[in-house]
C-alpha cells in the first residue's frame, strides 16, 4: 500500500522527476529568507523587493490553480510568498508613516 502511494507521487506529472516539483521546492528559499527578515528593522526593508515578492506570490498562486494538473507545491509556496511580502510591506509602511508623523506631533 505504501509503495503504491509512493509510486503514484513519483510518477505524478508534478512529481520529483520534473521541474514542476523542483522549481517550487527551491522557491521556498525565498519565503524562508523573507521570514528570516522579520527580525530585520523595518527601515532596512526594500519597497521594490517586497512588492516584487508580493506580486509574484499573488500572480503565481492564481496561475497554479489554472494549470492542469494542479500543482499544490507551487500554490503553497506562492501563498507563503504573498503572505510574507504583505506582512513586510505592512511593517515598512507602518514604520515610514508612523515615525514621520511622531516628530511633527512632538514639536507642537
UniProtKB/Swiss-Prot annotation:
List the source organism.
Arabidopsis thaliana
Q: Which UniProt keywords apply?
A: Membrane, Mitochondrion, Mitochondrion inner membrane, Transmembrane, Transmembrane helix, Transport
Q: What is its main location?
A: mitochondrion
Q: Which family does it belong to?
A: Belongs to the mitochondrial pyruvate carrier (MPC) (TC 2.A.105) family.
Describe the task this protein carries out.
Answer: Mediates the uptake of pyruvate into mitochondria.
**Any one biological process term the GO annotation gives:** mitochondrial pyruvate transmembrane transport
Q: Which domain of life is it from?
A: Eukaryota
Which positions, given as ranges, span the membrane? 19-35, 51-67, 74-90
GO CC terms, sorted: cytosol; mitochondrial inner membrane; mitochondrion
- Indicate where this protein resides in the cell: Mitochondrion inner membrane
Q: How does it sit in the membrane?
A: Multi-pass membrane protein
Q: Pfam families from the entry?
A: MPC (PF03650)
InterPro entries in UniProt: MPC
Under what name is this protein listed?
Answer: Mitochondrial pyruvate carrier 4
Amino acid at each position: 500500500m505504501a509503495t503504491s502511494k509512493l509510486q503514484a507521487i513519483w510518477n505524478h506529472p508534478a512529481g520529483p522527476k520534473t521541474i514542476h516539483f523542483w522549481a517550487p521546492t527551491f522557491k521556498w528559499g525565498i519565503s524562508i529568507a523573507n521570514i528570516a527578515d522579520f527580525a530585520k528593522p523595518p527601515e532596512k526593508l526594500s519597497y521594490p523587493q517586497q512588492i516584487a515578492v508580493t506580486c509574484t506570490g499573488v500572480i503565481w498562486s492564481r496561475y497554479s490553480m489554472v494549470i492542469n494538473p494542479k500543482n499544490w507545491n507551487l500554490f503553497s509556496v506562492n501563498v507563503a510568498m504573498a503572505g510574507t511580502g504583505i506582512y513586510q510591506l505592512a511593517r515598512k509602511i507602518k514604520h515610514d508613516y508612523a515615525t514621520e508623523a511622531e516628530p511633527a506631533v512632538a514639536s507642537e
